[in-house]
Amino acid sequence: TQYHVVPKIVYGAKAYHFSKKKHNSYKTIMKVHIASIPKNSEVFISVGEIDCRPDEGFIVAAKKRNKPIEELISITVKEHLKWFSEHNKDQNHNIHFFNLPAPVYDKKLDKVINANAANTVALFNMFLAQHIVLHDFNLIDVYKFTVGKNGFSNNFFHIDNRHLSPKIITEIEPQIRNM
């Protein structure tokens, strides 16, 4: 089967934005993207990396709200998947979610902050794997290929401190073929 790849980007989107009941611009843009893709298409979605950064998202919210980070991540992952499921009903896309790559150890930050970021990514991926099966979505695992010592990036697939290089495609393609 031949496929035509068309990137659709929602800049700055977090899983958090899709987990909230209230309307927001991220949801609007994503709805337009979902509707613009021919029905019954293979759709790949990657959100959550920004949510797991040490200076925003779950780590900051857990401190501010004095709530366990596990609770925030679990609810956010569950609700954002539910949002995508609801907005895919009319389109009937086969949706594939990427989990998060292991974070690159940031030498500008101390060990505790780096450990918190690595733990947050691991928790996000764990809850994503748990909740994704409830929606008949597929999981593309990039974490297992990017994780090295202590939960941090092995620096083989990262092109910079946050983004993966095209080298990761050799690990993604077999996962897609086996679905």
Task: Give each language-model segment a name.
Residues 48-51, 60, 84-119, 144:
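Active-site segments of SGNH/GDSL-like serine hydrolases
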Residues 54-69, 105-113, 153-157:
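Surface-exposed, active-site-proximal loop segments in enzymatic domains
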Residues 1-79:
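Conserved SGNH/GDSL esterase-like catalytic core that processes O-acyl groups on lipids
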Residues 96-101, 136-154:
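Acidic carboxylate-rich catalytic motifs and surrounding loops in phosphoryl-/glycosyl-chemistry enzymes
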Residues 2-7, 94, 136-138:
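Conserved beta-strand segments of alpha/beta enzyme cores
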Residues 105-142, 167-169:
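Substrate-gating cap/lid alpha-helix
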Residues 64-75, 112-123, 159-164:
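Alpha-helix N-cap and loop-to-helix initiation/capping positions
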Residues 134-138, 154-179:
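Histidine-centered active-site loop/cap adjacent to the catalytic His
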